[in-house]
Regions:
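Non-catalytic structural scaffold of enzyme domains
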Residues: 1-195
Length: 195
């Protein structure tokens, strides 16, 4: 049995996580808990073989040496958020603001939206988020796309913001990665106990 803690990056993803776990053929291999993640999470008392997290939380866990599979943000996730933003209001300049591991990779997004100036503001420390949002606003961006906390902070400054959502495929891939990492860890522990 694999003890798994899934840090939900935003409240709306909770049903998706539950559904994906229940539909997996190996769902009986997991004893899981879903925890609503929050800004600047200290990540104390994680009682699991492995965790799943996204953005700053995944980065912090990796830095602290906590076993973590990342809920990866795909280029498709970013494109879907930008399209949603465009449906809400016309814009000329868009800022992608968030954790480095969430907003850095979609460099080809400029090719899909040639009429919009898209600037990426990748951040390593979550505490830099508000400062980077202020910078994006000061530099004349019409809207912001980012994670849950980015959207909450953007609302404070009255700038339109859309959250990057993770789909079922990303959730399933993160669970598969977590299972594989936990099984490798179990085998390594067994080997070290034999020695």
């Amino acid at each position: 049995m694999i003890r798994l803690v899934f840090f939900a990056p935003y409240p709306e993803i909770l049903p998706t996580i539950r559904q994906v776990i229940s539909e997996r053929p190996d769902h009986d291999d997991f004893e899981y808990e879903i925890v609503q993640d929050f800004f600047n999470n200290p990540l104390d008392n994680i009682n699991a073989d492995i965790a799943i997290a996204r953005g700053f939380t995944a980065h912090t866990m990796q830095r602290k040496g906590i076993a973590c599979a990342e809920l990866k943000v795909t280029g498709y996730d970013v494109i879907a958020a930008i399209q949603k933003c465009l449906r809400q209001s016309p814009l000329k300049k868009l800022a992608l603001v968030g954790a480095f591991n969430m907003v850095y990779s979609p460099e080809n997004v400029h090719l899909i939206f040639p009429d919009i100036e898209i600037t990426t503001y990748p951040i390593v420390e979550e505490t830099q988020l508000e400062t980077m949002i202020q910078k994006a606003i000061k530099e004349g961006h019409d809207a912001i796309v980012g994670g849950h906390t980015t959207v909450l902070l953007a609302e404070k400054y009255h700038i339109p913001a859309v959250m990057i959502e993770s789909g079922r495929e990303s959730v399933n891939n993160a669970i598969a990665e977590a299972k594989m990492a936990a099984e490798i860890s179990f085998r390594e522990k067994e080997r070290s106990n034999e020695i």
